[in-house]
């Protein structure tokens, strides 16, 4: 069966790493064209070396290209501002969009958690790197619990892997991730913190997830977390638990007060993760960026499979 042709818009680090993943691990998609705005960018040069069509004239260059009419899926790795323009044009032309920017026009999407709900959406959003790493763990606790009252994530990433866009949008990162912890992860209230670690040599991404839940015991949570880690590892091999899940119980004799929510009885879980990148283009310590491109590719493969089945 013919694979679905795809385009990548944005030839920077994220777009180039995604390109290399699509070249190295082809499944349901065929990368047809890479779009940039700098004719001399490394990403476009690498695309040409691999025999992939390119344009340095942005979205308009893509729309004028003979391959455009064959594109079924487009990945946008530009900026939130540019994405709003791109989405309108691509949607009008019947192209499904996987959004790697903070624009969040489409629904938040984390492949092993809620991708099956969004296969027919014209636009899906990849949340944030911290969201892709930690929301599966919140969801793992939520699916075996009656309620997750609160979930907090702390994402620590190498300072070297945080470009100017990340640094300029720290507040947006925390707000978006916290909201997705609630909407996708299933927590009543979510909070997100990001730390830029200046250590040399650079540290790989590390994440800590805290949940306050009721209605499940430690063994249920432990098994659910292990199962979810295995699901994420299918597309991010470097995703793993740093140590066994830690638990603390709160009962009627030692209730925990949650600001704004009242007293809590149940289980506090602490899940510690690390994410090592595959090194397809970005260095392996950039697990925070790698998990975004890997999740985007996994999402695209599912969208493409849906299109192929309907053809």
UniProtKB/Swiss-Prot annotation:
Any one Pfam family match given in the protein's UniProt record, by short name: AcetDehyd-dimer
Catalytic activity: acetaldehyde + NAD(+) + CoA = acetyl-CoA + NADH + H(+)
List of residues binding NAD(+): 11-14, 161-169, 288
Enzyme Commission designation: 1.2.1.10
InterPro entries, alphabetized: Acetaldehyde_dehydrogenase, Acetylaldehyde_DH_C, NAD(P)-bd_dom_sf, Semialdehyde_DH_NAD-bd
Residues the record marks as active site: 129
A GO BP entry: catabolic process
Entry GO MF terms: acetaldehyde dehydrogenase (acetylating) activity; NAD binding
The entry's keywords: Aromatic hydrocarbons catabolism, NAD, Oxidoreductase, Plasmid
UniProt keyword Repeat present: no
Classification via CDD domains: ALDH_C
Family: Belongs to the acetaldehyde dehydrogenase family.
NCBIfam families linked to this entry: ac_ald_DH_ac (TIGR03215), PRK08300.1 (NF006157)
Annotated HAMAP family: Ac_ald_DH_ac
Name of the protein described by the UniProt record: Acetaldehyde dehydrogenase 1
């Amino acid at each position: 069966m013919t694979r679905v042709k795809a385009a990548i818009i944005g030839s920077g680090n994220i777009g180039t790493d995604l390109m290399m993943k699509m070249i190295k691990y082809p499944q349901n998609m065929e990368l047809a064209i890479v779009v940039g705005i700098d004719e001399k960018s490394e990403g476009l040069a690498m695309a040409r070396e691999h025999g992939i069509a390119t344009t340095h004239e942005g979205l308009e260059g893509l729309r004028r290209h003979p391959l455009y009419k064959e594109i079924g899926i487009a990945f946008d790795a530009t900026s939130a501002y540019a994405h709003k323009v791109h989405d309108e044009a691509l949607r009008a032309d019947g192209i499904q969009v996987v959004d790697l920017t903070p624009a969040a026009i489409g629904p938040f999407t984390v492949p092993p958690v809620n991708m099956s709900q969004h296969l027919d959406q014209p636009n899906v959003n990849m949340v944030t790197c911290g969201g892709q790493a930690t929301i599966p763990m919140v969801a793992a606790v939520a699916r075996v619990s009656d309620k997750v009252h609160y979930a907090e994530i702390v994402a620590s990433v190498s300072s070297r892997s945080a470009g100017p866009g990340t640094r300029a949008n720290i507040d947006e990162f925390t707000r978006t991730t916290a909201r997705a912890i609630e909407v996708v992860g299933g927590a009543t209230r979510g909070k997100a913190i990001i730390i830029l670690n200046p250590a040399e040599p650079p540290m790989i991404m590390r994440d800590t997830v805290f949940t306050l839940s009721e209605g499940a015991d430690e063994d249920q949570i432990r098994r659910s977390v292990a199962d979810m880690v295995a699901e994420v590892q299918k597309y991010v091999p470097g995703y793993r638990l740093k140590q066994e899940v830690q638990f603390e119980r709160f009962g009627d004799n030692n209730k925990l007060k949650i600001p704004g929510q009242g007293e809590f009885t149940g289980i506090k879980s602490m899940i510690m993760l690390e994410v090592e990148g595959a090194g397809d283009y970005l260095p392996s310590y950039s697990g925070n960026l790698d998990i975004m491109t890997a999740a985007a590719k996994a999402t695209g493969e599912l969208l493409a499979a849906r299109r192929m089945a309907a053809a």
